[in-house]
Amino acid sequence: MAQPALKVVDMPPVDKDKSKAIDAALSQIERAFGKGSIMRLGKSDKVQEVETVSTGSLGLDIALGVGGLPRGRVIEIYGPESSGKTTLALHTIAEAQKKGGVCAFVDAEHALDPVYARKLGVNLDDLLISQPDTGEQALEITDTLVRSGAIDVLVVDSVAALTPRAEIEGEMGESQPGLQARLMSQALRKLTGSISRSNCMVIFINQIRMKIGVMYGSPETTTGGNALKFYASVRLDIRRISTLKDRDEAIGNQVRVKVVKNKVAPPFKQVEFDIMFGEGVSKVGELIDLGVKAGIVEKSGAWFSYNSQRLGQGRENSKGFLRDNPKIAAEIEGSIRQNSGLVAEKILENAAPTADDLDEGEA
């Protein structure tokens, strides 16, 4: 049986009457809801340009595709315990403060260490902090701060600690399923519009739980239901992959961050970097690793060199050399930024998405 041929129908050009009707509708909408409530996409500079805040990690900024975390969006950072979630959020706050931004930290876990935050570069005098008693109180405070339009970065640590008032007032062991998920869903419905209008970045730190009875696929899931997965523009999965030691003493962790979801650039890139105890993200360690990937730093056996100058034997010695020679470190960083496209390609080569990543990214 012969297949019918596909017929391509050309749309007629927009006539003058249609154009007048569109303009009249646009002006009516703007009178009713305010200027900027509707616009042509190509004429809006705000829509085309994505403002970002650095994460404090050069590799992660490159992996995100736009040079950092986007402002005016919801961000989720999740992972196991002691993997570096709060450290990454505090680095982002420090970078925003360096550019004159106002930041807030909603400490639902009541566990923020101000001494450690100061070591990461956070200006504690200008940081707004709240330690709410209930999940409703935490999200009301978040909503008020976002609506003020004066906050640049706001961190909620963590979603798992946003305990509904009914659960706190109830008996220990009393089952109240779905309370936290409904709380998060309602809060995000309210917050999303305010976040976009105020251009405030809201980072939700989240924990991991295990789903019972899962036979196939990953049994891991995040707390607070599915709403955050859908509303988040960027989701970062951070994992500790090894412990860094100086002889027998642990001095830090090597972590891997995967961009599980990204609405502003291609997702599924991953990057590895060191988080040193009492110091945070090791920038000199990243310069060596990314420099090797970009072909800027040469590695021959155990030796690392840059422009025919030896940096040191072994990675730790090379890190020490760059720490003592900030000018050379700045040169390497500049070269890496100029070759960020090549570095991003190398990062993408090493991070093929899994079936679980694809499921998460579709949210």
Curated annotation (Swiss-Prot):
Signal peptide: none annotated. One of its GO terms (cellular component) is cytosol. SMART domains: AAA. PROSITE patterns: RECA_1 (PS00321), RECA_2 (PS50162), RECA_3 (PS50163). ATP binds at residues 79-86. Keywords: ATP-binding, Cytoplasm, DNA damage, DNA recombination, DNA repair, DNA-binding, Nucleotide-binding, SOS response. One of its GO terms (biological process) is DNA recombination. The keyword Membrane does not apply. GO terms for molecular function: ATP binding; ATP hydrolysis activity; ATP-dependent DNA damage sensor activity; damaged DNA binding; single-stranded DNA binding. InterPro entries: AAA+_ATPase (IPR003593), DNA_recomb/repair_RecA (IPR013765), DNA_recomb/repair_RecA_CS (IPR020584), P-loop_NTPase (IPR027417), RecA-like_C (IPR049261), RecA-like_N (IPR049428), RecA_ATP-bd (IPR020588), RecA_C_sf (IPR023400). It is found in: Cytoplasm. HAMAP family: RecA. Belongs to the RecA family. Can catalyze the hydrolysis of ATP in the presence of single-stranded DNA, the ATP-dependent uptake of single-stranded DNA by duplex DNA, and the ATP-dependent hybridization of homologous single-stranded DNAs. It interacts with LexA causing its activation and leading to its autocatalytic cleavage. This is Protein RecA. The lineage of its organism: Bacteria, Pseudomonadati, Pseudomonadota, Alphaproteobacteria, Hyphomicrobiales.
